[in-house]
Amino acid sequence: MRLTGRGLRCVRGGRQVFAGLDVDAAAGEAVAVVGANGAGKTSLLRLIAGLLALAGGAIALEGGDSELTLAEQAHYLGHRDALKPSLSVAENLIFWQQFLGGEPADAQASLAAVGLGHIAHLPAAYLSAGQRRRLSLARLTAVRRPLWLLDEPTSALDAEGQAMFARLMTAHLESGGLLVAATHTPLGIAARELRIGGAA
């Protein structure tokens, strides 16, 4: 499996964010997208996820499921945690399993993998910032998808949380998955760097 983007151009609010950008990621590979604030790191992830329209170029996922769109084979995890405070930790994850569809994994196992199994009953309103991030990351294993698109995935995570997430990413890559992450900090795993130039 391989993700390819050729000659990508992004325009937002009438302003060209970037143009002529190429991106590649093969099965088992991580790509760290780096650059100044406003350079277009998040925009690139959103283009790949199909959340923004391409102003130029083409994106393809070769070797994926031909009956599914690229978006249906990808997890897009934004920098904000999309959680409902009134729902429990487990209920939030089950909501995402049902919303995303596909083949769900065991929700309790996914919560345990991110260190939240013991508070599955707790309303999300009571979670710390780091725990909220862990719950968001649990979506990645709760529904299996080969491509992970991650925007500042380690934000709010302490050292233990970062090590936990590095293990999740490593397991994903070792199983043939691929990931592209926009980040200002090291991911904690081997990753090829894609630098986007320019500033806001």
From Swiss-Prot:
Xref: Gene3D superfamilies: P-loop containing nucleotide triphosphate hydrolases
Enzyme class (EC, first level): translocase
Binding-site residues, ATP: G35, A36, N37, G38, A39, G40, K41, T42
Organism, as annotated: Rhodopseudomonas palustris (strain BisB18)
Biological function: Part of the ABC transporter complex CcmAB involved in the biogenesis of c-type cytochromes; once thought to export heme, this seems not to be the case, but its exact role is uncertain. Responsible for energy coupling to the transport system.
Entry GO MF terms: ABC-type heme transporter activity; ATP binding; ATP hydrolysis activity
Gene: ccmA
Designated name of the protein: Cytochrome c biogenesis ATP-binding export protein CcmA
Organism lineage: Bacteria, Pseudomonadati, Pseudomonadota, Alphaproteobacteria, Hyphomicrobiales
EC number(s) per entry: 7.6.2.5
NCBIfam families named in the record: ccmA (TIGR01189)
